[in-house]
Amino acid sequence: KMWLDFQNDVKVTDVELAAQEGYASVEHTKRYTTLGMATDQGKLSNINGLAVLSNALNQPIQATGTTTFRPPYTPLTLATIAAEAKDEAFQPLRKTPIHAWHDRNGASWEPVGHWRRPYAYPRATEDRHAAVNREILAVRAGVGTLDASTLGKIIVKGPDAGRFLDMLYTNMMSTLPVGKCRYGLMCNENGFLMDDGVVARLSEDSWLCHTTTGGADRIHGHMEDWLQCEWWDWKVHTANLTEQFAQIAVAGPKARALLERLPGSIDLSAEALPFMQWAEGDIAGIPARIFRISFSGELSYEIAVPANRGLELWERLHEVGRDLGITPYGTEAMHVMRAEKGFIMIGDETDGTIIPQDLGLDWA
């Protein structure tokens, strides 16, 4: 036996038989015999194979032709693969629906994951430190707004969604009543904190899981990894809806007074919407979910609206809140206020080796 293709065990007689049976086209011979169809894509055997076929057909190799060589044997330049990934396209920035307003109003930016978020809004005579202090005082004494659209928003839905979340969070989410919220910690397989956020139960089989800004894609992937690899027969579906909603935090002792100036169908009173509950309806003619949650320690509401209505709501809030001293505040003011309240921040109080007990969160 005379071997031509050592990977697919094609012999000289196989090629000669192909020619005898009428496979004169080199592409037909290739598929009839599997000559050159292994991982080398013919680079190790096709030249000799073409010579054998040409002899069997009584014609020169040029007349027989060659087959098409395919990757991965034929190398590609990196420029072919990544030519567009340069300059601004190297790492595209993610912007919230309210980004343009922040830019027009003097926001000083900081990177948070792939997002750009306002660090502060310095005025003409202020440095960033002075701006942060002013924003904090404005929220503590009156009312402020924070663009929280970057926070992760993952829908978990299905008959097994409750027990699935019980496996991922340190506390029980299956017992959370519809209409209420619960703070959740998520740990990795070693018990170290990896993310946190407020979980809201939307219906009997649907939960909305808020994640950190930088953790949305990672946590969604974490969920899918467990679903697809370990609990593949559970009836659960997840969807990352982070960019489909704009979310605005309205915080401060005058937060309720501000929101009540806008027409809407949601009762914002403390009795109708107590802490850690949410309600759905409309505000200023915009469909919305309003969560009575706080990351500042002050009276606070987070309002989620369709992304294309986020700027509209933000501008309406600032329009009706001028006499209340409404002030936009950035991430640094948020950091200071949450630290004063004693709330943790993933990445600040955690470093990949922190467990809940280290932070006094064994209750969560």
PLM features: what roles do these ranges have?
Residues 1-27, 35-47, 60, 87:
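Noncatalytic alpha-helical scaffolds and linker/capping helices
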Residues 7-9, 21, 32, 48, ...:
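Glycine/proline-enriched, intrinsically flexible loops and inter-domain linkers
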